[in-house]
Curated annotation (Swiss-Prot):
This is Nucleotide-binding protein DvMF_3058. It comes from Nitratidesulfovibrio vulgaris (strain DSM 19637 / Miyazaki F). GO terms for cellular component: cytosol. Keywords: Nucleotide-binding. CDD domains: YajQ_like. Belongs to the YajQ family. It holds the Pfam family DUF520. Nucleotide-binding protein. GO terms for molecular function: nucleotide binding.
Length: 163
């Protein structure tokens, strides 16, 4: 039976490229001259650490990160920005958590949406992904269109399509 998986994966190399592009842009921008600004990607615990001189620069850094992620085809919905915290040197810092995988409640919403559509497919939650199977590939493509039209708070990718 044809099937596919609904997943939430972040291409870490593309995210690394986006972070490096932000670093280059910070070096060349006039409004960031003579200020301490850091952005670094921690691959192990899947987070990005931002450090800026003040909140205005932090907002600019956040906007640059989101726009560079879009350019690199990384959905900015996978970035969860934590609260801005002051540091001892009068600067501000912020952690950005990279969300990967589909949580249980989001997976349940996806399965409920598929079941409510009355299409002849079955959806099953498997760890951090949802497997959708059906008798016809056309039904599976309708499910993909249905899920693309909805907002679940996380970016969704459709992989492993088997006929």
């Amino acid at each position: 039976m044809p099937s596919f998986d609904v997943v939430n994966k972040v291409e870490m190399q593309e995210l690394d490229n986006a972070v490096n592009n932000v670093k280059k842009e910070v070096d060349t921008r006039y409004d960031f001259r003579n200020s301490v600004t850091e952005i670094e990607l921690h691959r192990g615990d899947k987070r990005i650490h931002l450090l800026a001189g003040d909140e205005m620069k932090m907002r600019a850094l956040q906007d640059m990160l989101q726009s560079h992620c879009i350019r690199r085809k990384v959905d900015p919905k996978c970035l969860e920005f934590k609260d801005i915290e002051p540091t001892s040197k009068g600067q501000v810092k912020r952690d950005v958590v990279i969300q990967e995988g589909i949580t249980k409640d989001v997976a349940q919403k996806i399965v409920k949406k598929i079941k409510d559509s009355k299409l002849k497919v079955q959806a099953a939650i498997q760890d951090d992904q949802v497997r959708v199977t059906g008798k016809k590939i056309d039904d599976l493509q309708e499910v993909i269109q249905l899920l693309r039209g909805e907002e679940f708070g996380v970016p969704l990718q459709f992989v492993n399509m088997k006929a």
